A protein has these predicted regions:
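Active-site groove signature of glycoside hydrolases
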Residues: 1-11, 34-40, 44-58
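Alpha-helical scaffolding within the catalytic cores
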Residues: 32-42, 65-76, 104-109, 165-166
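Active-site clefts of carbohydrate-active enzymes
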Residues: 73-104
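Substrate-binding cleft of secreted/luminal carbohydrate-active enzymes
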Residues: 104-134
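Glycan-recognition and catalytic regions of carbohydrate-active enzymes
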Residues: 129-177
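Carbohydrate-binding surface patches
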Residues: 163-201, 230
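Solvent-exposed beta-hairpin/edge-strand motifs
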Residues: 196-213
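C-terminal beta-strand-rich structural cap/linker in extracellular carbohydrate-active enzymes
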Residues: 218-239
Length: 239
């Protein structure tokens, strides 16, 4: 179901969704909602997957952090029923958007929604027109595919902690490695961040920064690193 929370009545859409769920119980049903529909529980959120289309480039002045916060809103709405969260992010949509995302914006919004709990991403509407945007789509999807087992790992680990609120992060353990995926979610401000590692990484002397061909020292179970606006770092630590 596409965007019906703007053009239909909740009580009309809910039985439509119920009928599809009953007819094909093993095919996931989702409704591509707006930011109005999900907190308003349009059609009682009668879907297997929560999904949102709210675009960074549909008007001027929007920030990547808005996409991240919207993902968190979806995650909270579906948490009790353990519904996965998908996001229809801005891709090439120049017929009704004023521009495409920049290279930095596309990488940041893709990483940002995953860090916030998103487990499915698609890009609206078609392949990028701008070369740097196309390059970003190729890069970020290669990276997220390489991190798929990490992101979905259920191995227990306490999270790394980062005091700066501009840095959004995810901590995962996979086998004998600890992963910290960290993003400066601010469009404009550079950040010097201190990352406090969980006790399992206390003996580490360094961390690989995946996809960047560099290492950073670990001192007193802490990493100090710089983040440009919208920059992501993926730290890998041997345990």
């Amino acid at each position: 179901v596409e965007g019906r929370d703007l053009s239909a009545k909740s009580e009309e859409v809910e039985p439509f969704l119920e009928a599809h769920l009953a007819a094909s119980p093993y095919t996931p049903v989702f409704m591509n909602n707006t930011k109005i529909g999900i907190p308003g529980r349009f059609a009682n959120l009668k879907t297997d997957i929560l999904m949102l289309d709210d675009y960074l480039t549909n008007r001027e002045g929007r920030k990547v952090l808005e996409m991240i916060d919207a993902t968190q809103m979806m995650w909270e709405a579906g948490r009790e029923e353990r519904k996965p969260v998908f996001y229809f992010l801005a891709g090439e949509n120049l017929h009704n958007h004023y521009r495409e995302p920049t290279h930095a914006e596309q990488i940041a919004q893709s990483y940002g929604v995953v860090i916030a709990g998103c487990r499915g991403i698609s890009y609206f509407l078609s392949l990028a027109t701008y070369p740097e945007h196309y390059r970003a789509l190729v890069e970020v999807n290669r990276e997220l595919l390489a991190l798929e087992d990490v992101v979905l790992s259920l191995e227990p680990t306490p999270p790394a902690t980062i005091a700066n609120p501009l840095i959004r992060s995810m901590t995962r353990r996979l086998g004998d490695k600890l992963y910290i995926i960290a993003l400066n979610a601010d469009n404009d401000q550079a950040v010097e961040a201190e990352i406090a590692l969980p006790a399992s990484a206390r003996a580490a002397a360094s961390a690989e920064v995946k996809f960047e061909n560099r290492k950073v020292p670990v001192e007193n179970a802490r990493i100090l690193d710089a983040f440009k606006p919208l920059e992501r770092h993926v730290y890998v630590i041997d345990l």
